[in-house]
Every structure is written in C-alpha cells, then in structure tokens.
C-alpha cells in the first residue's frame, strides 16, 4: 500500500518536472531562434 505522503510527493513532483523540462526546452528554442534571426 502506497503511503499518502509518498503519493503526494510523487504527484507534486511530476508536474514540476514536466514544467521544468518545458521551460528548459522553451529557453533553448528562444535562444536558437534569437541566434538565427
């Protein structure tokens, strides 16, 4: 049985991780487009 605390931590980390990856990709995309144009 999964502990509620552990479950809460996992459910809290997943969106943060996805948002972090999205921000990193967005920054890299902006930097690349800025260098091109």
Curated annotation (Swiss-Prot):
Membrane topology, record value: Single-pass membrane protein
This protein's record includes keyword Metal-binding: no
UniProt GO cellular component terms: cytochrome b6f complex; plasma membrane-derived thylakoid membrane
Gene Ontology molecular function: any one: electron transporter, transferring electrons within cytochrome b6/f complex of photosystem II activity
Transmembrane segments: 5-25
Keywords for this protein: Electron transport, Membrane, Photosynthesis, Thylakoid, Transmembrane, Transmembrane helix, Transport
GO biological process: cytochrome complex assembly; photosynthesis
Family annotation (InterPro entries): Cyt_6/f_cplx_su5 (IPR003683), Cyt_6/f_cplx_su5_sf (IPR036099)
UniProt entry tagged with the keyword Thylakoid: yes
Highest taxon listed in the record's lineage: Bacteria
A Pfam family matched in the record: PetG
Annotated localization: Cellular thylakoid membrane
Subunit relationships: The 4 large subunits of the cytochrome b6-f complex are cytochrome b6, subunit IV (17 kDa polypeptide, PetD), cytochrome f and the Rieske protein, while the 4 small subunits are PetG, PetL, PetM and PetN. The complex functions as a dimer.
Function: Component of the cytochrome b6-f complex, which mediates electron transfer between photosystem II (PSII) and photosystem I (PSI), cyclic electron flow around PSI, and state transitions. PetG is required for either the stability or assembly of the cytochrome b6-f complex.
Similarity comment: family membership: Belongs to the PetG family.
Name of the protein in question: Cytochrome b6-f complex subunit 5
Species of provenance: Synechococcus sp. (strain CC9311)
